[in-house]
Amino acid sequence: AEAGLPKAEAAIIGEPSMMECVTGHKGSGAFSFRIRGFEVHSSLMHTGVSAIHEAARLIEWANERNAENRAKTPSPMAAIFNPPWTTMHVGQISGGTAHNITAGECRFVMEMRLVPDDDPEVLTAALRAKIAEIEAEMQKVAPSARIIAAKGHDVPGLVPEEDGPAEQLVRRITGDNADHVVSYGTEAGHFQAAGISAVICGPGNIEQAHQADEFISLAQFEAGEAFLSKVVDSLCD
């Protein structure tokens, strides 16, 4: 705006959608945890604090939230996602010195993927309350024990629009009039939050992402190339 440039009307995010017009995705966020325990010989574990045991309590809390969310009847908005509930997941964890020493430190990363109906601030507040509860119990044994939680990425969800400019453009070019949403996150939510209509449309399948042999088929690559050419042509008309 300061440079006098016009605001974009639409954003097309080229993440893998099999060239379908995806109008919604879950929001996501993450916390990096560093838990400081208190090391003692495991024969006297009642006098120490195992950072790994305390990490397990937080991870089990996340599992309980998953079970609760799964048991809920999804709202119409949530029902279109797969799975139709908010999920919490730990994909990295490390810690400990030896099998016979209570772990002095444990690190792990917890991610969340939220359906549009769930408020990330509410989930974050519940997590922080659980952290405070566990930390207080740890410090009854060892005052130096700590749970340090650093907030990582925060990706807003993409909420389906009613015939937004981006959706209209992509549907006109692809001929895809079906409803599609995904559970992975993209930059689309950021564009939408900034007031720019956004959708996802790109070559490839998310099932091949983050694999040792990650790939995009030649047919999908060619379809993506043809799509971009048509987008350019439509803007030049």
Regions found by a protein language model. Give the residues of each.
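Acidic/histidine-rich catalytic neighborhood of metal-dependent amide-processing enzymes
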Residues: 1-30, 236-237
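Metal-dependent amide/peptide-bond hydrolase catalytic core
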Residues: 32-237
